[in-house]
Amino acid sequence: QGKRHWLNDSYWLVMPYKLKDAGATLKYLGTESTQTGKPADILQLTYKTNNLSPGIRHKIWIDKKSRLVSQWAQYAKLTDKQPLFVVPWDDYQQHGDILLASERGSHDISDIMVFTGLPGEVFSDFTRTDLSRYHEAK
C-alpha cells in the first residue's frame, strides 16, 4: 500500500525526474503550445512494466526556452483521447541540489522541504512527524 501511494504521490513532486526511470519509454510527439501559449516540445511517457499503474500515459510539455517541464497531462489508458488532467509545471526553485517546481494550478505544492539527512525515527515512527524541526538543505 505504501509503495502504491509513493509511486502516485511522487509524480506530483518529482515528475520531471521520472523521465529517467527504469522502464520509461519516451516518444517525441512534435511541438505544441501550453495552455498559457508558451511554445514547447512534446514528449509521451509510458512504461514497459509498471504493475501499479499499467497502461497509464503521460504527455509532457518541455519549454522551448528554459528546457524545463512546463505542463503535464495524464491519461488513464494508452488509447484515451482526453486526459484525466492537465496541469502547469511552473515556479521552479532550487532546494538543496535539486530543482523543483511548486505551481500545479489548483494542485500547488506550498510546503516543499529537502533534507540532506534525517534520523531513523522519521522512517520508523508512523505518527505524523514535524519535519520543520530538522535542518533543511539550502
Language-model features: locations:
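Long terminal segments
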Residues: F126-K138
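Gly/Pro-enriched, hydrophobic low-complexity segments
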Residues: P39-T129
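Flexible, processing/modification-adjacent segments and terminal tails
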Residues: Q1-I56, T79-D80, H135-K138
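A generic structural signal for solvent-exposed, polar alpha-helical segments
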Residues: W12, Y17-K18, G23, R67, ...
